[in-house]
């Protein structure tokens, strides 16, 4: 499972997010994207890197990037924790190829699952914006690693950090994959729901290609599962960031995704 699916999909993004933040991508992106992130989410522009990488790379890339931004002093603790509520998202390849094409036999359905996922994440971010304030930001002056180290050395450091994070992610995926197996035996609709609340990879073969399956797929990918929460806790370890906002953010995103899928299922499935 990890060798065929998890590691190829996540490891490059774990390395990339660490490399981009250490090379100063957050500072470079902040001025141009502050006009979007600040009015919508009351977050500085550098937070966009966590949101974009989270949407592209899948769980737990968004959380990893948010933690890196906080460690580098680019976000306050409150900003980083609000960002965690909506920046940690599912991989589009999983939504479009595995669920859409593989389960529903339609890339179009997968694209709609992806769009629902993005919209619910953004709506979750809007819901959490009321808790924060964000004015003009003076970013801390720091030496960018590429000024003192070669790009090769910076890459080696990012790969080492990514490997440590990848081991934790794989450990939780395997643990919850095994834990979810007995739940699948419950059958009916209860079994898939409980499996989906626990671990996403185990849910895939249990999803029926109908309206219920569409709502279940959207809701569970929005929630992420207990496995994703533990993966997130692992990448946040030592950062000082709390998991609470991530938990409530994923719960809200899962609920919003389910409602949107329920509204759209007749039109999407035709």
What is the meaning of each model-derived region?
Residues 4-9, 13-65:
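Membrane helical hairpin/interfacial module
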Residues 6-10, 109-125:
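Alpha-helical transmembrane segments
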Residues 23, 155, 159-225:
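Transmembrane helical segments that form the transport core of multi-pass membrane transport proteins
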Residues 40-104, 194-208, 212-239:
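Alpha-helical membrane segments and immediately flanking helix-loop junctions
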Residues 120-124, 128, 176, 180, ...:
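Alpha-helical transmembrane segments of multipass membrane proteins
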Residues 132-160:
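Intrinsically disordered, low-complexity non-transmembrane regions of multi-pass membrane transporters
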Residues 235-255:
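Interfacial loop-to-transmembrane junctions
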Residues 260-270:
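Juxtamembrane boundary at the C-terminal end of a transmembrane helix
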């Amino acid at each position: 499972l990890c060798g065929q699916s998890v590691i190829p999909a996540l490891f490059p993004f774990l390395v990339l997010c660490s490399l981009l933040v250490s090379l100063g991508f957050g500072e470079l992106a902040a001025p141009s994207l502050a006009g979007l992130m600040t009015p919508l989410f009351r977050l500085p522009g550098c937070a966009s890197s966590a949101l974009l990488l989270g949407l592209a790379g899948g769980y737990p890339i968004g959380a990893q990037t948010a933690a890196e931004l906080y460690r580098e002093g680019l976000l306050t603790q409150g900003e980083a924790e609000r960002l965690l509520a909506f920046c940690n998202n599912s991989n589009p390849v999983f939504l479009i190829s595995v669920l859409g094409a593989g389960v529903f036999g339609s890339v179009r359905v997968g694209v709609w699952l992806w769009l629902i996922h993005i919209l619910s994440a953004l709506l979750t971010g809007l819901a959490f914006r009321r808790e924060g304030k964000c004015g003009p930001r003076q970013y801390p002056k720091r030496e960018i690693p590429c000024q003192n180290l070669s790009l090769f050395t910076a890459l080696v450091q990012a790969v080492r950090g990514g490997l440590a994070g990848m081991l934790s992610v794989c450990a939780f995926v395997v643990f919850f994959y095994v834990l979810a197996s007995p739940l699948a035996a419950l059958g009916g609709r209860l079994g898939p729901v409980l499996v989906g609340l626990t671990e996403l990879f185990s849910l895939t073969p249990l999803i029926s290609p109908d309206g219920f399956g569409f709502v279940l797929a959207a809701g569970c990918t929005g929630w992420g599962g207990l496995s994703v929460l533990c993966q997130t806790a692992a990448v946040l370890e030592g950062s000082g960031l709390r998991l609470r906002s991530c938990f409530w953010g994923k719960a809200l995103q899962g609920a919003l995704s389910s409602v949107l899928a329920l509204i759209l299922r007749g039109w999407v499935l035709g």
